[in-house]
Amino acid sequence: MFSFEGDFKTRPKVSLGGASRKEEKASLLHRTQEERRKREEERRRLKNAIIIQSFIRGYRDRKQQYSIQRSAFDRCATLSQSGGAFPIANGPNLTLLVRQLLFFYKQNEDSKRLIWLYQNLIKHSSLFVKQLDGSERLTCLFQIKRLMSLCCRLLQNCNDDSLNVALPMRMLEVFSSENTYLPVLQDASYVVSVIEQILHYMIHNGYYRSLYLLINSKLPSSIEYSDLSRVPIAKILLENVLKPLHFTYNSCPEGARQQVFTAFTEEFLAAPFTDQIFHFIIPALADAQTVFPYEPFLNALLLIESRCSRKSGGAPWLFYFVLTVGENYLGALSEEGLLVYLRVLQTFLSQLPVSPASASCHDSASDSEEESEEADKPSSPEDGRLSVSYITEECLKKLDTKQQTNTLLNLVWRDSASEEVFTTMASVCHTLMVQHRMMVPKVRLLYSLAFNARFLRHLWFLISSMSTRMITGSMVPLLQVISRGSPMSFEDSSRIIPLFYLFSSLFSHSLISIHDNEFFGDPIEVVGQRQSSMMPFTLEELIMLSRCLRDACLGIIKLAYPETKPEVREEYITAFQSIGVTTSSEMQQCIQMEQKRWIQLFKVITNLVKMLKSRDTRRNFCPPNHWLSEQEDIKADKVTQLYVPASRHVWRFRRMGRIGPLQSTLDVGLESPPLSVSEERQLAVLTELPFVVPFEERVKIFQRLIYADKQEVQGDGPFLDGINVTIRRNYIYEDAYDKLSPENEPDLKKRIRVHLLNAHGLDEAGIDGGGIFREFLNELLKSGFNPNQGFFKTTNEGLLYPNPAAQMLVGDSFARHYYFLGRMLGKALYENMLVELPFAGFFLSKLLGTSADVDIHHLASLDPEVYKNLLFLKSYEDDVEELGLNFTVVNNDLGEAQVVELKFGGKDIPVTSANRIAYIHLVADYRLNRQIRQHCLAFRQGLANVVSLEWLRMFDQQEIQVLISGAQVPISLEDLKSFTNYSGGYSADHPVIKVFWRVVEGFTDEEKRKLLKFVTSCSRPPLLGFKELYPAFCIHNGGSDLERLPTASTCMNLLKLPEFYDETLLRSKLLYAIECAAGFELS
């Protein structure tokens, strides 16, 4: 309110209460919290002090009571020994002594007292056990259990020399025996219950751990099972090992049995084997007379494997035990028991570490070579324990025995075999091949399954029938999911990958031994008897199967290069957690392993597809365009953008031994941009499955890659560095071999200009603008590959292959000639020249393959007679030794017979029914590979010096022949007319030209080829039409002299045609000229 008393300023207020004591709110809260903290701290200190004081008082009182009871025990013991007022042969007195001892017992102080008590309990066991039948039965039972547990603890100190282990062992024997209880208690069921409780209490208190230590301490390391009767303690220890197993198996429910087997497994078997365990205990348990409960043990093992193998690394020891003991019990297993056995193999084989032996036998293309370097040495005992690597190798050997193989095969071949049997077997085989790198011919099981047509058919049926439920609720085959490249759940991939991998590996191996006649279902007659075929599929089935395999490969490529970065999906997290994987790093590792499985699957499927494609190439069984895929739309202009000039490397990536987003296959320079997903997929297809792309498109890709490389090396300008050589026409090969050698001209990609000298040593007219070089290269290749030159021979069909006797003709320099010829053929491909050189199919296959060797199926293209004889030998049913063969071959080179051994000491090794397959393959290998290995290697190196083999591997052997020599297709005159030039006054409308084309239209196809060869030196049209012919086909006015013949300059693809206006005359003159081959320098 306002004052209207006339005051114009505020008067100061005076407070008579002194200074203000108000606190800020924050300060007040802080002070309050601090006081509360101090009070809480004081209460905590007081409580702790009370606890400590209570503990100290309790400890002091207990120690005092221990001393009192210990003294009382000693007095009773003294009285009993002196025959005083405390007789020991009294049940209640024994109970009192036990109660006292259990109260104060300390092992370091009271061991002797315990031993004394054991001695009396054993002596008066019936009196003590009788307490189980009275009111103190629960107390007595508890005391027995505690005494047995003290036995176990005492025996764990068995290394103490002052300890007498005989009494504790006798105590275990007496109070775990039915014979101790039955005479006193009478009730058999109650006795069983008592012993069951005692044994389980012992088991939970380290019974088997005590036996493990006791065996290793008290038995000599040199002991073997045969020494059982000579070492009394060995027999007792073995009985103690078996007693809980036998008792629980015969008298206890499954839950109790499981506990005993768990302790036996974790404490006794999962630890590294000592010599005593390895040479005595395991052979003893494996003996059929021991009656080990093998089938219940297998059932229990499946439930406890995760604890006893993953965490402690006990898988090798357990697996060895299972295999060794199983040798005498497999025959007695029920069908359900065999299935459990198969599951055990599946479980422990996957946890078995990779042994150095299996790692070293794997080929160099393996993805995990580093594992073998870190593995242990085979067998070097450390502290008396066998090494893991030694046990691993022993496990793999035992798994490969005849008995094991027959057991597993019988399980699979039963009519009642379920899908689970096949899937579990596939998982076992998959682990053997992938993780342990075992090759099919080296493992009995794999080899036997590979040649069982019924198994392969059923395997493919299972693969085809596997399906998964989609989000929409519909069931979709897993093969279809793979073919689409759609992501698959962890569970589904775990189901199909082992089956698919096994099928592809086994079928691939069987195809190696199935010759073409058997593959195509031709009847085989040997000595009047028809042989059964090992082919599991008909040709019609193979067509569908090959299509599925092709699409699966393409789908896996899509999975390997996903459109988006893969994430850990929810079902993967659930699946990983079910097997104990929880951390993100563990999940990432599991994902990497999963993707590695897809990569490995891709390899084997691709190999099988290529083998089927190779069969179809040699002899068609698939319809036209069967191998082409509608999924892939790869165009030359897109792919060739990936060419990297600076690196001079084809695709910017190395050949796909591995694919996947985690293992990049790219080898891109720092300046190169990263490839898109589409580009990565295209490169993967062209590298691994090029035949799914049309041949014409691949030819375009090849030519555009050549053009890109040529632009870098040669350029468009005429003044860039090139190669200038002078060649004598009569010595074309000799001069070219000298002047175009690697030492003189290391880079044949450069433009070559040739100056020719005629037979008189005079210069031939003309400047080389490319035509003379092409003429020269054509003549050079004809000369070099002429069988008369000695470097190449011809098969019965007139096809070229390296002459094995070339070294005898030209000496040790023969490899240089093959290197030179390889470079020259590469130069022809590089310059897009067609040369009519018909090569043998096996030779082209050797050039294209990643390995220089080819298999027996190519022998038919080299020597059909030898191939036929080997097939006869393979199917021969009489005594093979009667044929008088040994492991040698005879060469008749240049009239000189030479005996060559196929293997060391081969002349002394007869060919028998057992080793004839090895003989057949060695003969084929010698003829196809060993004889000409150096020739082919040098030729391939020369070819790769000019044209990368990666480019050529886009084509099969037949396609490469077409690339070299052109296709056997009719000549299109319309195409030829469209790309023909005219000179010297001629034009398309000139009367002579019109007559010429009418005449040519009337030619047969053979006459048209002769005309083309007359003008261009090659009877086949260019692969992509006459627009690719360089220089272009040209008709030049040859003058008005009607007596002259048409002539040609093949170096310029030029036809010199006189002015023949009469159709009959032109026809006769032209036919005469092309038949007589009037050519170079005759115009």
UniProtKB/Swiss-Prot annotation:
The active site is at residue 1051. Residues 1-60 are annotated as: Cis-determinant of acceptor ubiquitin-binding. Keywords: Intellectual disability, Isopeptide bond, Proteasome, Transferase, Ubl conjugation, Ubl conjugation pathway. Its EC number is 2.3.2.26. It holds the Pfam family HECT. Pathway: Protein modification; protein ubiquitination. Transmembrane segments: none annotated. Changing residue 1051 to A: Abolishes E3 ubiquitin-protein ligase activity. No stimulation of in vitro CAND2 ubiquitination. The keyword Membrane does not apply. There is a cross-link at residue 903 (Glycyl lysine isopeptide (Lys-Gly) (interchain with G-Cter in ubiquitin)). CDD domains: HECTc. Residues 45-74 form the IQ domain. Residues 1-40, 355-385 are annotated as: Disordered. Highly expressed in skeletal muscle. Detected at much lower levels in kidney and pancreas. It is an enzyme of class 2 (transferase). InterPro entries: E3A/B/C-like, HECT_dom, Hect_E3_ubiquitin_ligase, IQ_motif_EF-hand-BS. Residues 744-1083 form the HECT domain. Residues 1-10, 20-40, 375-385 have a biased composition (Basic and acidic residues). It is linked to Neurodevelopmental disorder with absent speech and movement and behavioral abnormalities: An autosomal recessive disorder characterized by global developmental delay apparent in infancy, severely impaired intellectual development, absent speech, and aggressive behavior. E3 ubiquitin-protein ligase that specifically catalyzes 'Lys-29'- and 'Lys-48'-linked polyubiquitin chains. Accepts ubiquitin from the E2 ubiquitin-conjugating enzyme UBE2D1 in the form of a thioester and then directly transfers the ubiquitin to targeted substrates. Associates with the proteasome and promotes elongation of ubiquitin chains on substrates bound to the 26S proteasome. Interacts with 26S proteasomes. Interacts (via the HECT domain) with UBE2D1 and, less efficiently, with UBE2L3. This is Ubiquitin-protein ligase E3C. It comes from Homo sapiens (Human). The gene is UBE3C.
